[in-house]
């Protein structure tokens, strides 16, 4: 399953235990996220898992019965987290730096957070914003984020909001304003995590480089996907690959080999598929211009 969806749903399940999750990602990052949510000791080490560091910072900041030290690998301790910490502090969180200001490790004393409004730059990591939004639904006053500037990584923000909505939590994005409303509980339900579309890119490339008429099926992919990399289905039409969406799977077919010898695309919303597209273009002899 998708690592991005899995990490968000694991945090939501911790907040709303009636939620059940199937097809969770087997990735190391997701395993670290799961361990970090369930460890009972005072120190939690997430290794190199950046998403876990950010999501767990927000989660433990509002766990009133816990005091933890959140740390990671040497590399993780060089990755900034100050923007998220400052945002949580403005909401009333108690978080201290144990070494370098603005970087892990963190000492977090969980507190009751009422919620309210925050102003934050729109071009920060979408994981900072998602961390705040995921826990914001439990705040008595909810959470409203005023985003300054142009929003980057919009697909990941939309994924977070869509998952909240799927659980029955009202979360709305209007221009540069995001509001998540207080939701004390959600109905019992099971969510099946969709596979990573970035992983599907290798199969798209394989079909694009195959003979006309070549075909394969990939299970559990959805037409109405939450993932930005779903744009693969549109992009690979440029390389003669047609995508047919069935009820619980997709079919890739190499329909033609009469395509343009020049391909240009802005991958700002889907950077993870850039390398695969570049390799596809090289194999087909297509001149490639990718930006983002």
Question: Residues of each region from the PLM?
Answer:
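Short, structured segments at the rim of ligand-binding sites
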Residues: 1-292
